[in-house]
């Protein structure tokens, strides 16, 4: 028995659909732009749709006003999306239905293990609560892994092998604090939106096998995956909101777009200063070459706003 059709959209549309799904934990930075631009160019080069989803399911990590700022930043850099923005904060009903279905099928269970206990056994959950039949009080919900996914094909990097212990772990899909886990929400929403290919940063390679295992449990078609290289700051650390990466400049977006295109290994117009943002992006779509994107997970190339 598959999840109800009215809630989970079947991927019958063979047209390309890509997406960019930022969390509102801060403004977009250069690393965010690489992911947004790469997914945008891949979608447009395939004559496909490019969607934007705001992943606002973790209120403690959210910065007030960041979501709207992110949307304005995308517009400032010429990255206009198709259709309406999907907000995960408005999708709780879908996640609850997904949790209920998994529970009814015996594919999940309640777990009361603390983080301290799991760390004491090496950091990988050992299935301690799998057959203890706990109730929901003060408990997280874990997936009951039956056919772990230990590898997947990345269209840029080839076959990627996962850590076997991590791949076999019964991971959390609903947190003890009542929040929905990222892996559950992203799979439910990517399927609901009909996303056919996921283009994102290489920092999300690790959870991919878990997400694929969820697709398989639900009986859904698995999308293709492309993981783009990550940018470093001048100190050699990954650009991220946690590392206080500077927000994208609010001035002329063209030099930053050109820097992002260079980072992605793409051909750039020699006299780009004579081009508008729209013209730069049109040229980038026309010349987009996935095989030119560096395959390494982290590119030893630094960026700072001062360089623009």
Swiss-Prot record:
Its EC number is 6.1.1.-. Zn(2+) binds at residues 111, 113, 125, 129. Its cofactor is Zn(2+). It is an enzyme of class 6 (ligase). A motif ('HIGH' region) lies at residues 22-32. L-glutamate binds at residues 19-23, 55, 182, 200. Keywords: Aminoacyl-tRNA synthetase, ATP-binding, Ligase, Metal-binding, Nucleotide-binding, Zinc. ATP binds at residue 241. A motif ('KMSKS' region) lies at residues 238-242. Coiled coil: none annotated. Binds 1 zinc ion per subunit. InterPro entries: Glu-Q_tRNA(Asp)_Synthase, Glu/Gln-tRNA-synth, Glu/Gln-tRNA-synth_Ib_cat-dom, GluQ/Sye, Rossmann-like_a/b/a_fold. GO terms for cellular component: cytosol. The keyword Ligase applies. It comes from the Bacteria. It holds the Pfam family tRNA-synt_1c. One of its GO terms (molecular function) is ATP binding. Belongs to the class-I aminoacyl-tRNA synthetase family. GluQ subfamily. NCBIfam families: PRK05710.1-1, PRK05710.1-3, queuosine_YadB. This is Glutamyl-Q tRNA(Asp) synthetase. The lineage of its organism: Bacteria, Pseudomonadati, Pseudomonadota, Gammaproteobacteria, Enterobacterales. The gene is gluQ.
